[in-house]
Amino acid sequence: MIKYRNSSIHIQSVRGMHDCLPKDVIQWQYIEDVLKTILNGYGYNEIRFPIIECTDLFKRSIGEVTDVVEKEMYTFIDQHGNDLTLRPEGTSGCVRAGIENSLFYHQEPRLWYMGPMFRRERPQKGRYRQFHQFSAEAFGCVGPDIDVELILITNRCWKELGISNYLTLELNSIGLLSSRMIYRKKLISFLEKNKHNLDDSSKRRLYSNPMRILDTKNVKIKELLAHAPVLSDYLDDCSKNHFLNLCRLLDIANVTYIVNPYLVRGLDYYNRTVFEWVTDKLGVKKTICAGGRYDDLIKQLGGGSIPAVGFAIGLERVVLLMKLIKSSIINTRNVYIDVYLIRLGTYYQEYSIKLSEHIREKLPFLRLMVDCGGGNFKQQIDRAEKNNSRFVIVVDDKNFFEQTIILKELQSKKQEILKYDEIILKLRKIYNM
């Protein structure tokens, strides 16, 4: 975004979209690595697909009368007249990729992916217009055991990240479409009688998507809904049994949960199981992770009749929660430079290049930075300290001719002179490599 201030051009990021600076990336990478390791351990494979899809994909999958499609998508027409959209969620694109590349043909893939999503919502704490999700999808399994597996995966993620004590699992079953249509009529009838108590948002949804009113944040409407018909009373027997078995398996796995009869998802493709992991540590109750079954979506988008279930974790909210509880679980080693190489004299270039690459080859996990700014010894030491370096290696003309190295610990100021072939053994001992 370009703004003009006092006749000068001021360039800044688009509202609701933020930069992730190096000091923050360290925490992001840690979280992503934990999630990747867990998903890979459960046998899930990574898939990558475009952030831009045909707009019709989201209209058909999410639903044309949802807030996402009606108000929140970033949609544009390209130079060839194609109607395109920046993905507001990942499941639709993942399913499209699976159909297009025949991933579901005689297979039951289990996939994970992560990346940016885009929605034009009002920016606030934990809600951005470009946000990032880590998601998993499992295809071809119809029983509640796969639902449980995904919940167990998320539960394990929270434990590994040290945030499990701050999250609550909420569950519900929204049944089949036929059950929801019966319930929809009952709910509309109830709300019509109390229309004078509805806010503008609920009135707008009354006939287009009344079940979304169940997810309201308005306290007065929540009190009203306490007297409304309950969806569970209208579920078909198969959906009831599916949900009962889901709860039974979670009990066996010692997973604590709350059945929330008002829990619905904002995307039309969901059926039967829906779940959310929520926290109240970010102010108003915030969803950290959400998921559920979408057994009809693949067929709806032109594939076969293949059941599926998935979840999405909001990475920004995980980061916020971990910062709020001041989690010390992050490995801060990557914040620092292990060794900073200072170069002085005439012959430093040849020797420092040879030395630094030798160290990197033998100790690939060591963080080594070579000073390229020039200047005297003090100036280079200052740069080493600004980069949070633990040790410096000093290379000058004398070292070049003697094939030696000065290794200095910045905090203690202790230093020693080592031979070229001794530096690897010394650093291995220091860093237990």
From Swiss-Prot:
UniProt-listed Enzyme Commission number(s): 6.1.1.21
InterPro entries associated with the record: aa-tRNA-synth_II, aa-tRNA-synth_II/BPL/LPL, Anticodon-bd, Anticodon-bd_dom_sf, His-tRNA-ligase, HisRS-like_core, HisRS/HisZ
Keywords recorded for this protein, A-Z: Aminoacyl-tRNA synthetase, ATP-binding, Cytoplasm, Ligase, Nucleotide-binding, Protein biosynthesis
Compartments where found: Cytoplasm
Enzyme class at the top of the EC tree: ligase
Superkingdom: Bacteria
Catalytic activity: tRNA(His) + L-histidine + ATP = L-histidyl-tRNA(His) + AMP + diphosphate + H(+)
GO biological process: histidyl-tRNA aminoacylation
Gene3D superfamilies: Anticodon-binding domain, Bira Bifunctional Protein, Domain 2
CDD domains: HisRS-like_core (cd00773)
GO molecular function, one term: ATP binding
Cellular component, GO, one term: cytoplasm
Subunit structure: Homodimer.
Homology family: Belongs to the class-II aminoacyl-tRNA synthetase family.
NCBIfam families (alphabetical): hisS
Entry-linked HAMAP family: His_tRNA_synth
UniProt xrefs under PANTHER family: HISTIDINE--TRNA LIGASE, MITOCHONDRIAL-RELATED, HISTIDYL-TRNA SYNTHETASE
Name of the molecule in the record: Histidine--tRNA ligase
Organism: Blochmanniella floridana
Higher taxonomy: Bacteria, Pseudomonadati, Pseudomonadota, Gammaproteobacteria, Enterobacterales
Gene label: hisS
